[in-house]
UniProtKB/Swiss-Prot annotation:
GO terms for molecular function: 3-aminobutyryl-CoA ammonia-lyase activity. Pathway: Amino-acid degradation; L-lysine degradation via acetate pathway. Disulfide bonds: none annotated. It is an enzyme of class 4 (lyase). Belongs to the KAL family. Signal peptide: none annotated. Pfam families: 4HBT (PF03061). This is 3-aminobutyryl-CoA ammonia lyase. The keyword Flavoprotein does not apply. Residues 1-123 form the HotDog ACOT-type domain. Involved in the anaerobic fermentation of lysine. Catalyzes the deamination of L-3-aminobutyryl-CoA to produce crotonoyl-CoA.
Length: 128
């Protein structure tokens, strides 16, 4: 089971000089993806228990379009193991004009993570 969301990083997301977006924003996106996956599987938002690994691989800037994708790779009694990847798919081109942007021929992986979510048994309403 997979989920994908795509959104534009705004100037509000920029946290550091040079319009750099805080890496924690990618984790927030992964949390949203995980919530959708849990709703699809269990009919409940569940809880994010822990990240097992997080790797930041490339910078993200205001104006970048990011795809965040997640997949449930293992289903336990109440735990759900997930893998996540965030990719930059569109970048602004301020060198051309204030409103120019390019769709990347090859997306740039900006973050990868693995984690575990939990849906308590008494809240699971998914298909059995």
């Amino acid at each position: 089971m997979k989920s994908l969301i795509r959104l534009r990083m705004s100037s509000h997301d920029a946290h550091y000089g040079g319009n750099l977006v805080d890496g924690a924003r990618m984790l927030q996106l992964f949390g949203d993806v995980a919530t959708e996956l849990l709703i699809q599987l269990d009919g409940d938002e569940g809880l994010f228990k822990a990240y097992d690994s997080v790797e930041f691989m490339a910078p993200v800037f205001a104006g970048d379009y990011i795809e965040a994708e997640g997949e449930i790779v293992n289903v336990g009694n109440s735990s759900r193991k997930m893998v996540f990847e965030a990719r930059k798919v569109i970048v602004p081109r301020p060198d051309i004009s204030d409103s120019a942007a390019d769709v990347l021929a090859e997306p740039i992986v900006v973050c990868r993570a693995t984690g575990t979510c939990v849906t308590p048994k008494d809240k699971q309403r998914g298909k059995k």
